[in-house]
Amino acid sequence: DRERTVFAHFFEHLLFEGSKNIGRGEFMKIIPANGGTFNANTSQDRTYYFETFPSNKLELGLWLESERMLHPVIDQVGVDTQNEVVKEEKRQRYDAPYGKLLKVLNENLFKVHPYKDQNIGKMEHLDAATLEEFMTYHKTYYGPNNAVLIVAGDIDINETKELVKKYFGDIPSSSDVVRNLPKEDPIEETIKA
């Protein structure tokens, strides 16, 4: 939605808030307490979340990720908290000189494709968004038919498949996501910005 450009990046932050079974802020305590590390990232094409755990914590990692997809807490407290976090990230990274350089570069390379916009989105879109819109976004885009789960390391394949089925098998598919992105005309001239 061109009027809600901020949602993908915003969800990268919001889905660390907690779930029905994980208290607010507990994601970030559970993982290091079990020898793991974590992070997330949003690009123009995808958002990814990852945890790295000792292999004997595989089930914990799968449970955490299934909670993020199936039972996230999307409430006004989390939205308000992460609203400020995302705005601060924009000020520190995107409003800095190198961030502005990338903005100008993309605006000159792309005229109609969404790549012309910064992947952090527009803050006025964030401010205008309603709680219901955030809930609808999660329901639309966070389903197994729009996700890839990667498990690597010192694991037993058959056991891992059973654990994946246990934690992800009952997650309902979201709507099919149709991506009708506009085509750019080739750049046939020198662009000076």
Language-model segments: residues:
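Non-catalytic accessory/assembly modules
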Residues: 77-84, 92, 96-98, 103-104, ...
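Divalent metal-coordination and catalytic microenvironments
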Residues: 9, 49, 65, 86, ...
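Solvent-exposed coil/turn segments that connect beta secondary-structure elements
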Residues: 19-20, 54-56, 84, 91, ...
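Active/ligand-binding-proximal structured segments within catalytic/core domains
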Residues: 1-30
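M16/insulysin-pitrilysin zinc metalloprotease superfamily fold
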Residues: 18-21, 52-83
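Short beta-strands and strand-coil junctions in structured, solvent-facing domains, enriched
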Residues: 1, 71, 157-158, 174
